[in-house]
C-alpha cells in the first residue's frame, strides 16, 4: 500500500511513522509512506496557501492551487482513495478501517485554518472522514490515527494476523476482558474458566463477557448487532442480576 500525506507540517509524522507497527510495516515493504508539504506547490511568491473567504467571515480558507498542484505530482488513478480529514465527514469506524486496508493507494489531505476551498472537496476527494464530533487544529493527528488503524489490518503487518480479530468493534462488540500472570494479585484472581483448558467454555465465557461489556459501556452497538436467542438470554440474566445486587 502506498500512503501519501498532503500536509503543512510533515515533521509531525516522523515520530509515529518511525516506531512500532508502522515502522515494521515499512521495513517489510508492506507500506510505502510519503509526506508532501503542499506549501511547496503555492503559486504565490510568499508561499501563501490560505486566503480570506469570499463573502466575508472569520478565519482563513485553504486555497485550491497548492493542493491541486500537489495532487498532480502524485501518481494516482481512479482507484486512489483521497481522504479529506473533516469534522463534516462520516465518522471513522473499524468497518471503514477494514475497507481502506484493502486499498492500494491512499492520500490524506490534512488541512489547517478555517476550512478548505470547496473545489478541493468536490473535485479531488473520494472520502470525507471525521474522528468525532469535535474540532482539531489540523488533519494530521486524525490521519495518523487512521493510518495506524488501517495498516494493522493489512495481512502480514501483525506478527499474528489473527490477533486483531478479537479487537473491540471487529465483530460489532467490545473486546472481552484479558488476564495474564500472576493468577492472583492483591487478592484479585483470574476467572477459573480461563485456567480450565476447556476452549469451548473459554470461548463461551469470552462471548458472554463481550455482550455484557458492550451492554455496560456501548449499548448503542447492540442495536446493530444480530443478537441470537442465546445472546438475549445472557443479557436478560445479567440485567436481573444487576437488579438483585
UniProtKB/Swiss-Prot annotation:
EC nos: 2.1.1.228
The protein's matches in InterPro entries, at most eight in alphabetical order, are given as:
Alpha/beta_knot_MTases, tRNA_m1G_MeTrfase_C_sf, tRNA_m1G_MeTrfase_TrmD, tRNA_m1G_MTases_N, tRNA_MeTrfase_TRMD/TRM10
Q: Which UniProt keywords apply?
A: Cytoplasm, Methyltransferase, S-adenosyl-L-methionine, Transferase, tRNA processing
Please give one Gene Ontology molecular function term for this protein.
tRNA (guanine(37)-N1)-methyltransferase activity
- Quaternary structure note: Homodimer.
Could you give one GO CC term from the UniProt record?
A: cytosol
* Short name of any one Pfam family annotated for the protein: tRNA_m1G_MT
What is the uppermost EC class here? transferase
Superkingdom in the source lineage = Bacteria
- What this protein is called in its record is tRNA (guanine-N(1)-)-methyltransferase
Q: Which reaction does it catalyse?
A: guanosine(37) in tRNA + S-adenosyl-L-methionine = N(1)-methylguanosine(37) in tRNA + S-adenosyl-L-homocysteine + H(+)
Q: Which CDD domains match?
A: TrmD-like
Q: What Gene Ontology terms for biological process does this UniProt record contain?
A: tRNA N1-guanine methylation
- Function of the molecule: Specifically methylates guanosine-37 in various tRNAs.
Where in the cell is the protein located? Cytoplasm
Keyword Electron transport in the entry? The reply is no
PANTHER family in the record, alphabetically? Answer: TRNA (GUANINE-N(1)-)-METHYLTRANSFERASE
Q: Where does S-adenosyl-L-methionine bind?
A: 111, 131-136
Q: Which family does it belong to?
A: Belongs to the RNA methyltransferase TrmD family.
Amino acid at each position: 500500500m502506498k500512503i501519501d500525506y498532503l500536509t503543512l507540517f510533515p515533521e509531525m509524522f516522523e515520530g509515529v511513522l518511525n516506531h512500532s507497527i508502522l515502522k515494521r510495516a515499512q521495513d517489510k515493504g508492506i507500506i510505502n509512506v510519503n509526506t508532501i508539504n503542499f506549501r511547496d506547490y503555492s503559486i504565490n511568491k510568499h508561499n501563501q496557501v490560505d486566503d480570506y473567504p469570499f463573502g466575508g467571515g472569520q478565519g482563513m480558507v485553504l486555497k485550491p492551487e497548492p493542493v491541486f498542484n500537489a495532487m498532480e505530482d502524485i501518481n494516482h488513478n481512479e482507484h486512489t482513495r483521497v481522504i479529506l480529514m473533516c469534522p463534516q465527514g462520516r465518522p471513522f469506524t473499524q468497518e471503514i478501517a477494514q475497507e481502506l486496508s484493502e486499498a492500494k493507494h491512499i492520500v490524506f489531505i490534512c488541512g489547517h485554518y478555517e476550512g478548505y476551498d470547496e473545489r478541493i472537496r468536490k473535485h479531488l476527494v473520494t472520502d470525507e472522514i471525521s474522528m468525532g464530533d469535535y474540532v482539531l487544529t489540523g488533519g494530521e493527528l486524525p490521519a495518523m490515527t487512521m493510518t495506524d488503524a488501517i495498516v494493522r489490518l493489512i495481512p502480514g503487518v501483525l506478527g499474528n494476523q489473527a490477533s486483531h480479530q478479537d479487537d473491540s468493534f471487529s465483530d460489532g462488540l467490545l473486546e472481552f476482558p484479558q488476564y495474564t500472570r500472576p493468577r492472583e494479585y492483591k487478592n484479585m484472581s483470574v476467572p477459573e474458566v480461563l485456567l480450565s483448558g476447556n476452549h469451548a467454555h473459554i470461548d463461551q465465557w469470552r462471548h458472554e463477557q463481550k455482550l455484557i461489556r458492550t451492554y455496560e459501556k456501548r449499548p448503542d452497538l447492540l442495536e446493530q448487532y444480530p443478537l441470537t436467542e442465546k445472546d438475549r438470554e445472557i443479557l436478560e440474566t445479567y440485567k436481573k442480576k444487576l437488579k438483585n445486587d
